[in-house]
Amino acid sequence: MPRVWDSRLDALGVRVVTPAGAQVHLVEARWLDASQAGDKFHIFVRVQDANGQPQRDQEFRVRFTTETAETRIERTKGPGLDDFFGNFAMFPGLSYAVDIPSATSEQVTGLVRGAPGNPAANSSFFLVFQRGAPVEPPRPDDGPPTLDETTRRRLVALLDQAQAEIDAARALLEGNP
């Protein structure tokens, strides 16, 4: 199964650490920026069984450092408003890591509140872990495709033609026909 990964997480420094023999895998990770998060500044976690069914009352571990290393155990919730997501509030200036303590689990690291340049902004993460078969990490962006020479020449000719039309229109607008 391919992992659903919000590509903005890469720029934020969010990473997935996969230990040998992992039994629980991250299958989805999304980030909500300030415009999407509203008044929320939380890490939301859902744990699914091997068939993809969300499970209530599953523990998830949140690690962060203040003056000392801190670990908190939270639980997922049930159906309804929470839709099986448990949550943990984030505070500015701290970096968080999340995993599932009941089994060998992938760990998501580098979760921080806010956005680059504004650590106090509201933002949230949605993480979905699933027991069972490993997932395929997302393929890195390979960039634009390589063009064959004929296609490249056609595109350059089209761009030249478009530029000539733009130049002619500009001359008309400026009164220099």
Give residue spans per PLM region.
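Exposed beta-strand and adjacent loop surfaces of beta-rich binding modules
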Residues: K40-H42, D57-R61, S95
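Short, low-complexity, charged amphipathic interaction modules
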Residues: G143-P177
